[in-house]
Amino acid sequence: VSTEVVRGRAYGHGPRRLVRRTNERHQWEKNRARAGREERGATGATEHDTGLTVDDLVFHAEYHDVRADEELARALRVRVGTRLVERLYRTRYREEAAPLNMTRSYLVHAMVASNPDLLDAAREPWPGGTQSQLCTVGVEVDRVEERVTARPPTAEEARELALPPGTAVMVLRKACVDTDGRVVDWSEVILPGDRTEAVFTTRLERW
């Protein structure tokens, strides 16, 4: 199952768009997860990271019914063979041919099946993103754990992201953990090294 949403003018040519990812985006998302649909739909995480508007973006999503292999079972803390919802996302700036990143995300089917809309790619892009989706089935995200590594791209990644020769990719693996300690979403994001900036802000307690 897949869906693609194109907003704004037709594709043209323009400069590569910088994506600035900050760890503060997660609290920003949570603050909006229970807001009204109009507020949630006005802007999303991609717009937050790029400074673009909703109308600047071309969005594509695919959903698949899959079973957990050893890697996914370990990441989601479930048994091998557990039924999952695999979600593949590509979002690009309408002036560029390559997506901003390559994302694959996994939800445990049993956790979200009570809301059929969460199994339907045609409902994407979901206003408010994953935290808002999870909120509809009574799940509150307590913390987000992220691990970032760098490596050379595969041939497929280099082609799809239109990477210049010698450019590395950043691989971000993210686990969303709920208030009961369950991993409720695990995702892997492949970020192009030539146009991604990671910003980490740590709030310190005052003396």
Give residue ranges: language-model regions.
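Residue-level recognition of beta-strand microenvironments
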Residues: 63-65, 90, 175
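C-terminal regulatory/effector modules of DNA-binding transcriptional regulators
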Residues: 78-80, 92-98, 103-207
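N-terminal leader/targeting helix
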Residues: 85-86, 97
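HTH-adjacent hinge/linker in prokaryotic transcriptional regulators
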Residues: 1-83, 112-125, 129-132, 140-142, ...
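Internal active-site segments that recognize and position negatively charged phosphoryl groups
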Residues: 74, 87-92
